[in-house]
Amino acid sequence: MNVTSKPGELVPESDVAAIMRGTHGDPFRVLGMHGGGGAPLSVRVFAPQAAEVAVLGQGGKVLASLERIGAEGFFAGTVPGEEKFPYRLRFVSGPHEWEADDPYRFPEVLGELDEYLLGEGRHYQLYTRLGAHPAEIEGVQGVSFAVWAPNARRVSVVGAFNAWDGRRHPMRKRIGVGVWELFVPGLHTGDLYKYEILGPSGERLPLKSDPLSFAQEAPPATASVVHGLPEAEWHDAGWMQERESRQRRDAPISIYEVHAGSWRQGLDYDALAEELSAYVREMGFTHVEFLPISEHPFTGSWGYQPIGLFAPTARFGPPEGFARLVDRLHRDGIGVILDWVPAHFPSDAHGLANFDGTHLYDHADPRQGFHRDWNTQIYNFGRQEVANFLQASALFWLDRYHVDALRVDAVASMLYLDYSRNAGEWVPNRHGGRENLEAIDFLRGVNERVRLDHPGCITIAEESTAFPQVSRPVEDGGLGFGFKWNMGWMHDTLGYFRRDPIHRKHHQNDLTFGMVYAYSEDFVLPLSHDEVVHGKGSLIGQMAGDRWQKFANLRAYFGFMWAHPGKKLLFMGGEFAQEREWNHDASLDWHLLDDPSHAGMKRLVADLNREYRKRPALHRMDCDPEGFEWIDAGDSENSVLSFLRKAPGEKPVLAVCNLTPVVRSDYRIGVPEGGEWREILNSDAAIYGGSDVGNPGGLQAEEVSWHGRPASLRLTLPPLATIFVTPA
């Protein structure tokens, strides 16, 4: 139709009706200022909250009063001038009057480079453009919103600022990349918002949280919170300079795994920064690994069903609080590892599921897209936008929060299409195989980007199968992880210590088999949260025997673990023999430290960490077969095993484990050199709650060949204990 000066003819009736119904997919074609270049200027506004609308020019001068078209609050009218110009709007409703800038007068938010990178699936700093960003455009303060929803008919940003009315702030669609964007003047940090989306058939979906929000309401509330890119005052330059050397294969890495909500209940991020950092420093751990911090709706998932992959959970305070926690740990010389969950996401209505009315982030076929074990959706790793979203999430935590490492959860479920599925319940890959080729490419891509963009940061795989080369470089055909959890070692050794000592002589292989494959990957030895939940009981509860034997067994186990090749990981509470199975709704039982047995266990773990860090023989060759040597793995009859840990130019450490409750006197063990040796750690020492049997004072190696070595020691082996001996 021809544009005239009559207000009712400034815009087609069908467009007016669609705007008022909230179904128009191209609001910038209708709303805002139109004309210029020889055509009359007009302004169209949808403001159902107003009775009158006027257009203001420079200095607040009223240029035109717009005419109301219909009963739903659509206003239009001509304004003087030949070319478009900045303007404001004045609204009147009864006794109330207010002014605001028109969102529909501002230019596009995304630039050409953004469109190109989004189209390529290589916008690795996606979080700098998508999400909600406080911004100033043309001198006006507000918030820029952008969200990917390519199949939506209409997307609006809603919040208290527009009475959660999806008709009032519909967004512009960037057709080429499927991103909807809008700059809303006058909004501020802290404002709540969601997206109202109409699906491909026009159906109104449940309100959605922003997939790239940097802050969320504390659950059970589900709104996103306007919050700029995390900005923190960092004081960790010293740590950042040393980080690469602190996380190499030859560095001592001893990880304390923590659930932030139950280490000590009631602590926010700042209180954790003070109390947790001091405790970890006291205990001598090199790193803290947090169970997922990403925002998650269900507390009982422990964070492993996240929705806010760019937002630290609000349960413990604002995002800045989490940054301060990381900063404090770094200042105390402690690295930070985050559990990161790219394998799957929950089906909560406000999350990623059915985001734009389609299976946008997952697969439509449940044989590919639904995980029955967890009732979650599986990401479509083959879709470049989804892979880009996840890669950007990984890089975000390293970039904006100075996180040092990501422990990638449930990698096995990503690698295999038939994971936890029977025949006929999965779809083979293009070669007819069971490997998820898209997930493999995705993991390699993430690990390469971490290596290239954040040198010194590492990734760690929780991977429970024999998939090859998980921790080998991508260029060598590997997946590119820095380390892999050794689930087989954990399963075998924990099973051994559950056995009555009388039967252990038949199961020595459970302790020795791990060395057959110990160097096939770069391993972390994990005694994680998974081993103290779901009816398994606590670590101390799983040990065989009466109370004395349980404590002795766990002390011996820890000694064996810290002497064994591989980096160390221990879940909170294990260090002082928490007796109750872990409960995410309750604090650890710190009162147990009033008991000498529990206090002794804690002291042992601290001393193990001290020895592990201090002695290169115990860590420098963790990932090199030259750093380990069996002395005697075959004395199964006595349930004794002995081995050396070595490093070039350093004193070796002899570890001897006696895993029955029998003292063995004058037990001869071959050693590589004569001279004086000394016992440097004994898990049966009285200070740890043991019976104090051992080898005080010096030990003189005799020139008696034994176990194929030129000299030997005669040792007293304490019951159910591990000892460390080294040349004096």
Swiss-Prot record:
Q: Which domain of life is it from?
A: Bacteria
Note whether Glycosyltransferase occurs among the keywords: yes
Coiled-coil residues: none
One molecular function GO term is: cation binding
InterPro entries to which the protein is assigned, alphabetical? A-amylase/branching_C, Branching_enzy, GlgB, GlgB_N, GlgB_N_E_set_prok, Glyco_hydro_13_cat_dom, Glyco_hydro_13_N, Glyco_hydro_b
A single Gene Ontology biological process assigned to it is: glycogen biosynthetic process
Give the matching Gene3D superfamilies.
Glycosidases, Golgi alpha-mannosidase II, Immunoglobulins
- Which top-level enzyme class is recorded in the Swiss-Prot or TrEMBL entry? transferase
What keywords were assigned to this record?
Carbohydrate metabolism, Glycogen biosynthesis, Glycogen metabolism, Glycosyltransferase, Transferase
The chemistry this enzyme catalyses reads: Transfers a segment of a (1->4)-alpha-D-glucan chain to a primary hydroxy group in a similar glucan chain
One cellular-component annotation, GO: cytosol
- Which residue positions are annotated as catalytic? D409 (nucleophile), E462 (proton donor)
Q: Pathway membership of this protein?
A: Glycan biosynthesis; glycogen biosynthesis
Pfam families hit by this protein: Alpha-amylase (PF00128), Alpha-amylase_C (PF02806), CBM_48 (PF02922), GlgB_N (PF22019)
- EC nos: 2.4.1.18
ATP-binding: present as a keyword of the record?
no
Q: What's the subunit arrangement here?
A: Monomer.
By sequence similarity, the record places it as follows:
Belongs to the glycosyl hydrolase 13 family. GlgB subfamily.
Entry function: Catalyzes the formation of the alpha-1,6-glucosidic linkages in glycogen by scission of a 1,4-alpha-linked oligosaccharide from growing alpha-1,4-glucan chains and the subsequent attachment of the oligosaccharide to the alpha-1,6 position.
Q: What is this protein called?
A: 1,4-alpha-glucan branching enzyme GlgB
Q: Which organism is it from?
A: Cereibacter sphaeroides (strain ATCC 17029 / ATH 2.4.9) (Rhodobacter sphaeroides)
